[in-house]
Every structure is written in structure tokens, then in C-alpha cells.
Amino acid sequence: MGISKRAWQVAGAAAGGASLFGGGLAIGRLLRLDSQRGDYRKAWEDHNLATLDRLRECDENPEGERPYLIVSLGDSSVQGMGASRITESYPARLASAINAQLDREVLLLNLSLSGATIESVELTQIPQMRGLGLLDGPYSPDLVTLTIGGNDVMTEDM
């Protein structure tokens, strides 16, 4: 005995509804991520400015112990896209974990940019480090993290 035409129609409608529902969820998630992009970029800029101010304070008081400095380079995964807030990004969590182990201040500069590629890290983020005096100045980082490549595999050159 075969499956009735009505059963096929119901199954098809259910599958179509599930597809539309799933597609709607995916679109909603993409829109949330898109709105995060600007918010997170601004939050990291504010964080970075505060970190640079703290480094300047340390410069003015050279007797104190130099903070442990982490610089993070990369793309949206480094920005924390998808996390509930920037403190849940992996660089912030890494800085927090290192801070828990060290008996000194830990500072984080996150120079990442959503949409970054290998080329853009090379042409913008590394020169930004140089411009801030982080490659050859008194505040060379103790740790540099790099997460890149997701956007590169999406290009036609790959």
C-alpha cells in the first residue's frame, strides 16, 4: 500500500514550513551579527584607547612593573562576533585567564577587524602595531594572537 497524495502534501508543507522557519532563524542571526559588528568595533576602540592610556601612565612611572601586554590580530572571530559581549571573546577570556595566573597587571589591545583577511592584517593591523610603537618600542607585546583565514577562503583567489 502506497502513501496517499494527502500524506505527501502534508509532509511537503511541513518540510517547507521547517525550511522557512530555519531560514528565518538564520536571517535573524545574521542581522544580529551585523548589528554587533559596529557595536563591538566601537567597544574595542574604547577598550584600546583605555589600554593605551594605561600604557602611557606606566611610561610616566618607569619604576613600576610593566604590565603583561597581549595584542590580538585577526577577523570577526577575534572581535567576538556571536558572543554575548566583548568580554566573552576569546582574547578577553585569554587575558582574564593569564591575569588569574600572573602576579602582575595584564593589558589587552585588540586590533582585529571584522572581515579581515591575511592581506588586510599584513597591510593594516601589523602597521598599526608599528605605529603604536609595539614592534620596536618599550611596549613590545608579551603575546600576540592571530586568528585569520575564514574570510580568505571565501574569496575567488582561493
Regions found by a protein language model. Name each.
Residues Q79-M158:
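Conserved SGNH/GDSL esterase-like catalytic core that processes O-acyl groups on lipids
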Residues M1-V71, G80:
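N-terminal secretory targeting modules
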